[in-house]
Curated annotation (Swiss-Prot):
GO terms for biological process: DNA topological change; DNA-templated DNA replication. Its main location: cytoplasm. It is an enzyme of class 5 (isomerase). PANTHER family: DNA GYRASE SUBUNIT B, MITOCHONDRIAL (PTHR45866:SF1), DNA GYRASE/TOPOISOMERASE SUBUNIT B (PTHR45866). Keywords: ATP-binding, Cytoplasm, DNA-binding, Isomerase, Magnesium, Metal-binding, Nucleotide-binding, Topoisomerase. Belongs to the type II topoisomerase GyrB family. This is DNA gyrase subunit B. Mg(2+) 1 binds at residues 437, 511.
């Protein structure tokens, strides 16, 4: 579009109505006040920047989680207008800037002005003002027309007037906000959730750069999302680690007149050799999880185009075999995206697009492009058709296998499916089913359970890897058949019915070893691929059986993990100890000693983060130069040896200036501020980070109240931690459980099944795209990506966690 169509100033800001209800009923505007609503605040601010990009005025967005938990979103767009808004000023009887209008008045913004934004993701116009209303602290910085402006708010009310900060070369808007803890159940942002959405936006808006940073974690590298190929790159990303039937995704793009203006439609699609259908649809960058007219139009056109090609080229295999849309979409990965001037969504959460004109536009554009593509690429078309017929034959075979399974289940209903031991309660809301690894553990679980509401289904060995199997084979697998029959809700897209689920909680309980982890992963793969609604509705849980039982005299406790065990031993060892620094005679005990120990643990966390980047700590220490440790690592090009350490931002900038590709390859080893704080705190005790491994010269003497334990001098910080853990082990008996079968029924009940004491982890789907990527890589046919993943993460594994 022409960037000069209309000047974007205060006159472009249109007000529809006023604000107060947001704080009283926040759920009406952001969905809820839990984790979902919290992250929705960030999306609302980012959407404004994306709208600028869609209008052609913004190329970069930076999203940062601040060290103190706040959020910063900045862009290089035009900047929110700051002039006096005449209409609202007259209405309120005072001079009010357009910036204040945008941030304090509901349904105010440039998106209602058709010349300022042709298309916008924020349909309801409540976005940024809603974020302001629900923030304890909110700061807007605007860089516009050579001047920098700032304004601060709290809970939607201005704390300062619009301030002019001075001249600037920057342009754009920066929003900083801190969610109000009196509104939200949690104010802790999950970077995985944010990264999922930012990745989506970068794919959907070709050419925009979105940078994500997390200042809370010294070991986290900033992530840059940039995809020149747009949704074609999105499909390639989704098909990564899968065997694609042809190299480049088919791209569909077109624009046609709709009821309210031009509708821009685009789609990208590619088949792979797998059996799962994966289609994501979007309207104005908003995920439409329930589809809508754009997806229906695309799917209809796809089915017609394939059937038409088969008919016109006499490729039908059999008159008796009829093809369905499901057959055509087996192994299909597709992205469908539409830009609509006036989108009509069903409900505030915008899950489904309802514009009828969009459906016909999507169908027409898709049909034209696909028909032409198949005619111009007969080899690809034949490959697709061959797969479609194999899918149809497999569907018929799976249908027969399903019917056989249903008949067999009906005949065997008197003894229940598999080895299921059912509960007495019949209300699914009150019932739970444990899927237990092995007959031995299953026996203990049966004896230890509360038979009123707990059912037990033992499974034998590793179940089928459904990532590599068609439905026909899945139905023939005895263990999976038992799970399907026990749950009672069916399987797949067409035959799954959540209302028929017999247990509201499905709990996976496996051993705390490698085999147990493998079985758990196989089960999760099955649920994700064929009963994903169970995960989406929070019905799948993972039991947390203890790894250790520690006892001291008559007292005992259970410990879930190696990390918890280390903390427990360290706490015991520290509790009755005293340390003396030999060079200064400084003494520490009680809370003062705990603070010193926690500081050493911070050093250990720093080392772990460093070694996750494949930088051994000893090598890092050896690179100390001119009073400084390296801040960045510049790895060599693929297949070459060497690599350079960079000690400052200036050295990094010089490397990027010499080679633009360096920007993507240079690794930030740590956050300088966090490292400096650790060093400063160590200096308070007369130590440095290198003393974690290398002796200082003088030692730290540890003594205890136990007269039978002699004093011991440690010469490194690591030795202090190891010795205190050793003291913690004295006088206690430690039993490590390798399997559930090692616990008797009472122990299993007390630790893993008693609702009053147990720990369950609910399986959630924060990022469906990344979940698909991981399941494909770890459980799919392709070996090289799995090997690369294992090799790249090998340094992240602590030897103490290996089950050898």
């Amino acid at each position: 579009m022409d960037a000069q169509e209309k000047k974007y100033d205060a006159s472009a800001i249109t007000v529809l109505e006023g604000l107060q209800a947001v704080r009283e009923r926040p759920g009406m505007y952001i969905g809820d006040t839990g984790v979902t609503g919290l992250h929705h605040l960030v999306y609302e601010v980012v959407d404004n920047s994306i709208d600028e990009a869609m209008a052609g005025f913004c190329t970069e967005v930076v999203v940062r989680i601040l060290e103190d938990g706040g959020i910063s979103v900045s862009d290089n767009g035009r900047g929110i207008p700051v002039q006096i808004h005449e209409k609202e000023s007259a209405k309120q009887g005072r001079e009010i800037s357009a910036l204040e209008v945008v941030l304090t008045v509901l349904h105010a913004g440039g998106k209602f002005d058709k010349d300022s934004y042709k298309v916008s993701g924020g349909l309801h116009g409540v976005g940024v003002s809603c974020v302001n209303a629900l923030s304890e602290k909110f700061i807007a910085n605007v860089f516009k027309d050579g001047q920098a402006y700032s304004m601060e708010f709290s809970k939607g009310a201005p704390l300062t007037a619009l301030q002019v900060l001075g001249s600037t070369d920057k342009r754009g808007t920066e929003i900083l906000f801190y969610p109000d803890p009196t509104v939200f159940s949690t104010c802790v942002f999950d970077r995985a959730i944010l990264m999922k959405r930012l990745r989506e936006l970068a794919f959907l808006n070709r050419g925009i750069t979105i940078i994500f940073e997390d200042d809370r974690d010294a070991g986290f590298d900033k992530v840059t999302f940039f995809y020149e190929g747009g949704i074609q790159s999105f499909v390639s990303y989704l098909n990564q680690n899968k065997e694609s039937l042809f190299p480049t995704p088919i791209y569909i793009q077109g624009s046609k007149r709709g009821d309210d203006g031009d509708i821009e439609f685009e789609a990208a699609l590619q088949w792979n050799s797998g059996y799962s259908e994966l289609i994501y649809s979007y309207a104005n960058n908003i995920p439409t999880r329930q589809g809508g007219t754009h997806l229906t139009g695309f799917s209809t056109a796809l089915t017609r185009a394939v059937n038409s090609y088969i008919k016109s080229h006499n490729l039908a295999k059999s008159d008796k075999l009829s093809l369905t849309g499901e057959d055509i979409r087996e192994g299909l990965v597709a992205i469908v995206s539409v830009k609509v001037p006036n989108p009509q969504f069903e409900g505030q959460t915008k899950q489904k697009l309802g514009n009828s004109d969009v459906g016909s536009v999507a169908q027409q554009i898709s049909g034209e492009v696909l028909t032409t593509f198949f005619e111009e690429n007969p080899q690809i078309a034949k490959t697709i058709v061959d797969k479609v017929f194999v899918a149809a034959q497999a569907r018929e075979a799976a249908k027969r296998a399903r019917e056989l399974t249903i008949r067999k289940s009906a005949l065997d209903s008197a003894r229940l499916p598999g080895k299921l031991v059912d509960c007495l309660e019949k209300d699914p809301e009150k019932c739970e089913m444990y899927i237990v690894e092995g007959d031995s553990a299953g026996g203990s679980a049966k004896q230890g359970r509360d038979r009123r509401f707990q059912a037990i289904l033992p499974i034998r060995g590793k179940i089928l890897n459904v990532e590599k199997a068609r439905l026909q084979k899945i139905f023939q697998n005895q263990e999976i058949g038992s799970i399907i029959a026990a749950l009672g809700c069916g399987i797949g897209t067409d035959n799954f019915n959540l209302s028929k689920l017999r247990y509201k909680r499905v709990i996976i309980m496996t051993d705390a070893d490698v085999d147990g982890s493998h079985i758990r992963t196989l089960l999760l793969t099955f649920f994700y691929r064929h009963m994903s609604a169970l995960i989406e509705n929070g019905c799948v849980y993972i039991a947390q059986p203890p790894l250790y039982r520690v006892s001291k005299k008559k007292d005992f406790r259970y410990i879930l993990s190696e990390k918890e065990m280390d903390g427990y031993l360290l706490n015991l060892g520290t509790r009755e100890s005293r340390v003396v620094f030999d060079d200064t005679a400084r003494e520490l005990e009680g809370t003062a000693l705990e603070s010193f120990v926690n500081l050493i643990l911070e050093v250990e966390s720093f080392i772990i983060a460093l070694e996750k980047r494949a930088i051994p700590f000893s090598e890092f220490l050896d690179m100390f130069r001119d009073g400084a440790y390296p801040l960045y690592y510049y790895p060599p090009e693929s297949g070459k040896q060497g690599g350079n350490y960079l000690y400052s931002n200036e050295e990094k900038e010089a490397a990027v200036a010499a080679n633009e590709e360096a920007a993507a390859r240079i690794i930030e080893l740590y956050k300088a501020s966090a490292f400096e704080e650790i060093q400063h705190n160590l200096n308070e005790y007369g130590y440095d980070i290198r003393h974690y491994l290398h002796p200082k010269g003088t030692g730290i003497t540890v003594s205890t109240e136990d007269s039978k334990t002699p004093n011991y001098t440690c010469y490194t910080l690591k030795e202090v931690i190891d010795y205190l853990k050793g003291l913690g082990r004295k006088g206690i008996e430690i039993q490590r459980y390798k399997g559930l079968g090692e616990m008797n029924a009472d122990q299993l009940w007390d630790t893993t099944m008693n609702p009053e004491q147990r720990t369950l982890v609910r399986v959630s789907l924060k990022d469906a795209v990344e979940a698909d990527h991981i399941f494909t890589m770890l459980m799919g046919e392709e070996v090289p990506p799995r090997r690369e993943f294992i090799e790249s993460h090998a340094l992240s594994i602590r030897m103490s966690n290996l089950d050898i």
